[in-house]
């Protein structure tokens, strides 16, 4: 059985694959206007903080799910931190799905950040670190903020780009499979 934990807007597409759909909408917190604006502007800091808060909101629910369902593997999107965090917490093998490019120290060298993005990262890290500390009493094992976003060479990862297009693809271990983009022809 494949269980897919996601949000209601994806329910029909998930069910169409034959997977069981589990709604996570009830765990979305109320956002302040400032937080919502931060997310709309794709602030990495705000996105990470909200994902950590969703993890805490889902904690009791997912603890029970792991006890009763007992998954063999967690397949989580690279920016779905609650998926990663719960795989680590419950000692379940993790496979990371990366829809664009995989990022490690080598690959991140090609990225050009705007001054605004750099400021968000520099000033955001202390905020993220503060939020991460809130996870420890609940049994979550996380080293630091970078361990959430950066790819490591030990975690099995599916990357939806071609190895030829992946920057510094040679720096990734055999735990990575580059499957190319998912392109579908439009049905008329």
Q: Positions of the model-derived regions?
A:
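Short beta-strand element of Class I
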Residues: 2
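Nucleotide-sugar-dependent glycosyltransferase catalytic domains
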Residues: 5-188
